[in-house]
Amino acid sequence: MAYKLLIINPGSTSTKIGVYEGEKEILEETLRHSAEEILKYDTIFDQLDFRKEVILKVLKEKGIDINELDAVVGRGGMLKPIEGGTYEVNEAMVEDLKIGVQGPHASNLGGILSNEIAKEIGKRAFIVDPVVVDEMEDVARLSGVPELPRKSKFHALNQKAVAKRYAKEHNTSYEDVNLIVVHMGGGVSVGAHRKGRVIDVNNALDGDGPFSPERAGGVPSGELLEMCFSGKYSKEEVYKKLVGKGGFVAYANTNDARDLIKLSQEGDEKGSLIFNAFIYQIAKEIGSMAVVLDGEVDAIVLTGGIAYSDYVTNAINKKVKWIAPMVVYGGEDELLALAQGAIRVLDGVEEAKIYK
């Protein structure tokens, strides 16, 4: 049976929605919200009714009867660290999303919006593989400073979706393979997937790992300390250097990887150096994750928007092909990944996990 699903993926200035019948998309809309609209609300949670009304209005205009839905799926937010999987939205989750236990983020509305709409029609609401998925082994958490443990914050939804896609296409299960998955977008995350669990991954939000179009990745800690206490920068300014204005933005004043690729292809000296450093750091991180997996790697999977570039993927492959074969799934399809997570539960392939 093809289940009819509403998928909700809230961003800071837009809400992306999709309606699926099974894995077939029958509607996709990006509902843009102006700065004026968003600024009316003091907190992200205060936007709930406004966003819900916009979603229901668009569905009505497009002739979608919400009473025909089998479930509603939201993007998971900044919850407590949890293992990967599909979770049924419950009161404990809604409360934690309201307060944002790991910080405010538009995705916190995903679970709440899906729950609100599902309650109206007496159906179930789910979230799938939020950014806070944490399956790291204890040995990977130590950083050298007890007060600064390493944290698992990465592109869990897309990493898990492409890992499962690889397993399916190779007639095996995600729980039977060892993969290194590299998501390359505004941030870069490199995860070691061992038998269905991401046992180590760089904190792609504001932690360690390769630099990216907008993020600094791992930086020399002594110099960072000097910068923090130099009196020249506020806390917010230093954070911006790490997230938002780091990486390509800092070196080349662009957050578009295509600009760097073009400079490199044209032989521009500075552009080539930045591009080569980007490739170098990703390859180095892949090598590090190969060690985490004891050298037992079935494949290296590249994904995210930057993986559309053969120039990038070929450059990485040149450095890491001795580790394992490379597979490329360019881009990311978060709506489909959310739909697939719910379908696995509705079909009885997986059980819905309980958030506590």
From Swiss-Prot:
Domain of life: Bacteria
Alphabetized InterPro entries for the sequence: Aliphatic_acid_kin_short-chain (IPR000890), Aliphatic_acid_kinase_CS (IPR023865), ATPase_NBD (IPR043129), Butyrate_kin (IPR011245)
Catalyses which reaction(s): butanoate + ATP = butanoyl phosphate + ADP
Database matches in Pfam families: Acetate_kinase (PF00871)
Gene Ontology process terms (BP): acetate metabolic process; butyrate metabolic process
tRNA-binding found in the keyword field: no
Purpose: Catalyzes the conversion of butyryl-CoA through butyryl phosphate to butyrate.
Official protein name in the record: Butyrate kinase
Organism: Clostridium perfringens (strain ATCC 13124 / DSM 756 / JCM 1290 / NCIMB 6125 / NCTC 8237 / Type A)
